[in-house]
Structure formats: C-alpha cells, structure tokens
Amino acid sequence: MGAAVNTRPVRNHIDFATLVAVITLMLLSLGVVYSASSTIAFKKFADSEEMLMSHLLRVGLGLLAMFVAIRFDYHRFRTLSKPALVGAIGLLALTLVVGVVAKGAMRWISLGPLKIQPSEFAKYALLFHLCTLISTKGEMIRDFKRGFVPMMVWIGIVTGLVVLQPNFSMASIIVLLSMVMLFIGGVRMKHLALTAAPVVPGMVGILLLEPYRVIRIREYGEAVLGRFNAGSIPYQLRQGLIAFGRGGIFGVGPGESRQRDFFLPEAHTDFVYSIIGEEYGFVGTMFFMLLFLLIMYRGYKIARYAPDAFGRNLAIAITSVITLYALVNAGVTLGLLPTTGLPMPFVSFGGSSMIFTAAAVGVLLNISSQTDLHPRATQVPVVGSVNAGKAAVGKVY
C-alpha cells in the first residue's frame, strides 16, 4: 500500500540563477538586436530604432508572461494541457486558411499590429500534454493501443499541420522532442522503433520535396566530407563566418558591425549569433553560450529534484527546448549544421518565440519554487513515474 501523497505546493524560493540568466539574455538582446536590425529598419521604416522598439515591447511582454507563469501552480496544467492543445491545433488549422504569407510560408496569424506564430504555442501545448499523459497513465504508457497510440495521434496531428505551413524545421524539432519525452516517460523501445520505421523515411521524403532543402543538405554534406571551398559556401553562411572572423577574440565593439549592412541576411533573427561574434568576439559568444549552459544545468537539476513525475517531465521538456534551440542556432551560424531557421531563445528578434519561451521558463521557475534543490536527506523517489506503480489513474487521451 502506497503512502498518501501531499499534493499541496510547498513554496520555496524560485531558482535565482535561472531567473538571472534569462533576464540577462533578454537585456543583452536589446543591444544586439538594435545593432543587427538598425540598417534594415532604416531602409524599411526610415527609422533605425523601429525594430528595437518592437523588440523592446516583446521583451516586456515576455517578462510579463514569465512572472505571471511563476505565480501559476504548474499542477493546473494537468487539466489545462488538453484544452490548450486542442486550441493550438485549431490555431494551426486557422493559419492555413487566413494566415499571413511571408517568404513562401503561411506561419503567422495577424492580430492587429501583432503577428503570432501558432506553432510556437502548439509546440509547448503538445509537450505539456505529453507530460500530463506520461505522468497520469503510469504503467499503461507501455501498452501500445491504450498508451502509445493516443499520444502518437496528438503528435501526428500537430506535426502534420506544421509541415503543411510549411515549416519543416519546426516539425522536425517537435517530433524529436516528443520522442525524447516518450522515451524518458517509459514508452517501450520497440514501439518507438516501430513508429520510426515509417516516420523517418516519410520525413526524408518531405525534406526532398523542396529543391532549396536539397541544396542545403548537399552543401552541408560537402562541408562534412571536407569539400567545402570559398566558392561553394552558401552566401548567408559565408557572410556569417566573415562576421565571426572580423570579431576575433574581443570583437569590433558594440554597434560596429559591418556585416549587418545588407551583407548578412536575417542578421537580427536566425544569424544574430554571428553579429554577437562580430561585435563582442569569441569572448562574447562564449558568455552567451555559458548563460544557456547555466539554464540547462539548473533546469535539469530542477527536474531531478522535482516533487513529482509531472513536474520532472515538464522541467525536462522546457529545458530541452531551450537547450536544443540555442545549440542548433549556434551550430547553424558556425556551419556545423544545415540552415534551419530556428531562432536563438531570448536573443533573436521574434515575438512568439520570446513570449512563449519566457512563459515556459516561468513554469520551470514555479516548479523550482516547489522543489528543494539542496536536499539534506535521502531523496524520496518521484511519485507517479512509470516505476512508481502499476495502476493508471483514469483514461486520459
């Protein structure tokens, strides 16, 4: 007979290190985005500060979302995750009908002066609901029909709608993170392998449908095989690497970037890390990356000592999203990965990513406020994990 579980939140202090790291990234992004966007902002709006003001508003909304989420008990997402996911799916479908077309993709919905990217919300809604199912179903998660299939249906719906936008990079990230969460949650490996058999070839087929994706993969393959030369390096990557080269160890100084002046496309979004390297040098890029590594370390520590399986899974999911995005963005700008279009969390210009990721950090900090990160006694096993019991609580889909 199991002991009674006290689900009443125990309030400790939030994890200060994570909070400081995130706010530091947000504040530093103001100077970086201003420098990276000033030239293009002047060309488009005749005002070099236009995009800075927009970014400042988004940082403010992100901070507001984070502090609201800090006060919101994460256990409530057990009941809210499914309605949120259904709403996110509705927004994804709506995007395909009334979405704003930009650069050949329909990924945004216009709300007056604001544009939101529903896939950013859907990504977190899906992961949160998977965490709910994993912690609620218990041992049933290992059953193919009753546990595994319902979760794959949710993943398939979200991924399919994102692919139709089209946004292959986001769809790939959603699939990868979902599979990681299912693996951590205790899904049978043979079920994951059975799913991967058709999914991987299918994703490869979708990847090869667009010629520009084939070109990216070929160029990346040439780099891996050592056949890169100055003439074959893609223009955007070449300009990004020039920015790193100009920056050297200590950089050319804040606001002194030359690559932002119509040389480097997407300098304020996908390739903002190159501008950091140019203006602040190797030292600056390492400082930014250390902040992300600090968030990763503290996030996984929060997960380790979370008071229950749901909190543990949420912390793992949120931390994994931020870590993966930061590493992929940096890897792309350094030529280590094919171009993906994924932003650098808390730094790149972009409202939906900033607001939803900041809100997710607020959830992470709420978990930390109910977690003892410095246990002085033997840790009690997490209640609600796959190995904690055989019975599942109700039928949740």
Task: Locate the predicted segments by residue.
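Membrane-helix boundary/helix-loop-helix interface segments in multi-pass membrane proteins
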Residues: 2-25, 31-166, 330-345, 349, ...
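Hydrophobic alpha-helical transmembrane segments
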Residues: 57-62, 279-299
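Transmembrane alpha-helix boundary/anchor motif
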Residues: 64, 72, 129, 204, ...
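Hydrophobic alpha-helical segments of polytopic membrane proteins
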Residues: 82-83, 87-89, 145-163, 168-208, ...
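Hydrophobic, glycine- and aromatic-enriched re-entrant/interface helices and adjoining loop segments
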Residues: 102, 106-108, 191-287, 306-314
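Interfacial segments of multi-pass membrane proteins
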Residues: 172-191, 258-284, 342-357
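Membrane-proximal intracellular helices of multi-pass ion channels
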Residues: 211, 286-289, 296-299, 303-311, ...
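Loop-to-helix entry and N-terminal half of a specific, functionally important transmembrane alpha helix
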Residues: 300-341, 347
